[in-house]
Amino acid sequence: MEDLSKPFSIPQIDLYRDLDWGAEQLLAIFLFRTFSKEQRRRIWSLGSIQVVKKSAHAVIEGEPSRGLFLILGGQLSVYKRDTLTSDAHRLATLKSGDSFGELSLFDQAPRSATVSADAQSYLFTLEAGLFETFLDREGDQTKAQFYKNCATVLSEKFRVLNTDYISSQQLLWKYALRKTKE
């Protein structure tokens, strides 16, 4: 993959317009891996490129927003606000090839976290409405494959969440038991 962490240059802008290049970038998103190259080309043509300046927000927790983002260059961090203290906690750092907002392609829930740029970043954005129209045109088989991919992604995330939850509960119990012995 080409180094896209540097500021925009004319060759990069041309590269972003290249449907074949874009179709290859979409392979980074599991949801699209089973789509044909021609389908990925059409998806790429529906999206746009967004430049997010350093410290600016790509999405804000709680805001309505229906669309997917693929990081083409730069680095962003994901923050979740603590409902008790209102403090923001960094959950993850994202880089080129990472994506976020996939669930909003079929879920109208507000954003669950804030994503901010650590450096100027370049994102491919795909609005949910445009993608829904694409799926309608592609037919039932493509829709079924997409939703099967979604189920796979959700089950993987659920397994990780379960593992993390169990680990955190074990740590809390160890800490609580140690405190009671003191």
Predicted regions and their residues:
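Cytosolic regulatory regions built on CNB/CRP/Popeye-like sensor folds
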Residues: 1-182
